[in-house]
């Protein structure tokens, strides 16, 4: 099945969320947006909170998906994470005792539009 760009991104984020859940994480937020930016997934495990950028591609023709996470994108993600932790939380200081990590999840649909052929590369501490 061929997807629109938005559908493809949404599909990648759904697969990434399931992947993290299988690794023992609980998804706290999906597509968190605030006035300073957006984060694809926010997930937690015991003592760890991760802010995760998801990048999906049909091929590596234009490079690795994570290469699209440039300095500007990193700056926006960090600002958004800071906002989330200090301003956007309904319960402030909820994650004060958690380690914070920034990850990138690369999803490469190696079978083209076939959903059953997906390579996932989880880059922990990506930045």
Predicted features along the sequence, with ranges:
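Domain-level recognition of nuclease-like catalytic cores that cleave nucleotide substrates
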Residues: 88-127
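Acidic-basic catalytic patches of nuclease active cores, encompassing PD-(D/E)XK
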Residues: 1-30
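Anionic group-transfer/hydrolysis microenvironments
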Residues: 40-42, 55-57, 105-108, 126
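Residues at secondary-structure transition points
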Residues: 3, 7, 11, 36, ...
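Mid-chain, well-packed structural core segment of small domains
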Residues: 67-96
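Active-site metal-binding core of divalent-cation-utilizing nuclease and nuclease-like domains
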Residues: 26-49
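Conserved catalytic cores of phosphodiester-cleaving nucleases, focusing on short active-site segments
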Residues: 41-61, 65, 77
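Structural motif
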Residues: 36, 49-51, 99, 120
């Amino acid at each position: 099945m061929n997807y629109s760009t938005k559908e493809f991104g949404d599909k990648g984020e759904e697969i990434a969320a399931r992947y993290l859940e299988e690794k023992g994480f609980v998804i706290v937020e999906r597509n968190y947006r605030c006035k300073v930016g957006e984060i694809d997934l926010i997930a937690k495990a015991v003592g760890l909170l991760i802010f995760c950028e998801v990048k999906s591609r049909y091929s590596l023709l234009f490079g690795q998906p994570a290469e699209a996470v440039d300095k500007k994108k990193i700056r926006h993600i960090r600002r958004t994470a800071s906002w989330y932790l200090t301003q956007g939380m309904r319960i402030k200081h909820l994650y004060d005792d958690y380690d914070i990590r920034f990850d990138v999840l690369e999803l490469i649909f190696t079978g083209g539009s076939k959903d059953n052929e997906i390579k996932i590369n989880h880059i922990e501490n990506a930045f």
